[in-house]
């Protein structure tokens, strides 16, 4: 008879492996399904300085490996597999993957959300080499330097404000002639002496040698192009949660995030959503880790009532 796990975690990022650690340490049988490698999006971050315990910071890949090892130390099992189909409504949850079918009494969804790329040639190769998607995560090394932010919504405005406090110069590039961000951001950005707006502009090329050296901007109305020198660009044009698998069963918000409050419980009992994939105000490594621990607390309550 195939094993039925107490908990199956989908996704091996910080939220997923924290859930696995807490559950395994509590004596639950735990399987983590990860399609690539430990760390999730965090693994792409060159330097993490805002996660406690590392006085010199740590790279995301190494931190992801450490989280995996911590969970496996207490008996959690990792399977490198991609989930193709999820049946979550029953008392026993069934997941069909590239490596076979797995069953669990509870499921923790930690599939994350990916930044939407600009789609400019060379973008992927320059990630971590001047191309970034999170100012709070990756902005610190650019203190006193020239940076650019692409986008016009709340996240772009917040990134530009964050960077304006440390960078020598911040270019905010937006394809329209005004910000879509809420009004609370407008006055501080307009008042910042080191923020320059590039309205009605898109990025047509990334200039680089071994690292990013600048951007080629194209006028939306004129089609004219010009080059802009900068040490980094922070792309903030939205995020895409990895929730397509769950659309037919779970309640999602209009942006595709799984609706779950601070308990991490979803619209299906025994199913929890943690980290960047759920509705929440702040998406950071520390908040993802918190979600993982909280999910196990409520999963244990559920298991005690449904054995």
Task: For the regions a language model picked out, list residue spans one by one.
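Glycine/small-residue-rich loop that forms an oxyanion/phosphate-binding "nest" at active or ligand-binding sites
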Residues: 78-143, 147, 152
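Glycine-rich, N-terminal phosphate-binding loop of Rossmann-like dinucleotide-binding domains
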Residues: 12, 111-112, 237
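FAD-site-proximal beta/loop scaffold in flavoenzymes
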Residues: 119, 125-141, 237-287, 291-294, ...
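Phosphate-coordination loops involved in phosphoryl transfer and adenosine-cofactor binding
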Residues: 4-6, 80-81, 143-145, 200, ...
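A Rossmann-like FAD-binding core segment of flavoenzymes
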Residues: 71-90, 95-96, 101-102, 164-262, ...
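Beta1-alpha1 glycine-rich phosphate/pyrophosphate-binding loop at the start
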Residues: 5-74, 157-183, 253
């Amino acid at each position: 008879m195939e094993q039925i796990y107490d908990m199956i975690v989908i996704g091996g990022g910080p939220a997923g492996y924290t859930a696995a650690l807490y559950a395994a340490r509590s004596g639950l049988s735990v399987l983590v399904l990860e399609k690539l490698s430990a760390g999730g999006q965090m693994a792409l971050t060159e330097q993490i300085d805002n996660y406690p315990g590392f006085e010199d910071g740590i790279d995301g890949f190494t931190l992801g490996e450490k989280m995996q090892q911590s969970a496996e130390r207490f008996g959690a099992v990792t399977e490198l597999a991609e989930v193709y189909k999820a049946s979550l409504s029953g008392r026993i949850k069934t997941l069909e993957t590239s490596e076979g079918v797995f069953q669990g009494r509870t499921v923790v969804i930690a599939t994350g959300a990916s930044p939407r790329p600009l789609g400019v040639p060379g973008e992927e190769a320059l990630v971590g080499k001047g191309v970034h998607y999170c100012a709070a995560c990756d902005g610190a090394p650019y203190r006193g330097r020239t940076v650019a932010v692409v986008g016009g919504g709340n996240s772009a405005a917040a990134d530009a404000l964050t960077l304006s406090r440390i960078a020598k110069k911040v270019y905010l590039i937006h394809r329209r002639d005004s910000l879509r961000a809420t009004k609370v951001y407008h006055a501080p950005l307009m008042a910042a002496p080191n923020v320059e707006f590039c309205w009605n502009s898109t990025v047509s090329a990334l200039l680089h040698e071994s690292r990013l050296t600048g951007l080629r901007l194209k006028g939306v109305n004129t089609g004219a192009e010009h080059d802009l020198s900068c040490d980094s660009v922070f792309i903030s044009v939205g995020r895409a949660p990895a929730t397509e698998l769950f659309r037919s069963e779970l309640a999602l918000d209009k942006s595709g995030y799984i609706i779950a409050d601070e308990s991490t419980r979803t619209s299906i009992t025994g199913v929890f959503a943690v980290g960047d994939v759920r509705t929440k105000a702040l998406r950071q490594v520390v908040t993802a880790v918190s979600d993982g621990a909280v999910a196990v607390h409520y999963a244990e309550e559920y298991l005690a009532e449904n054995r």
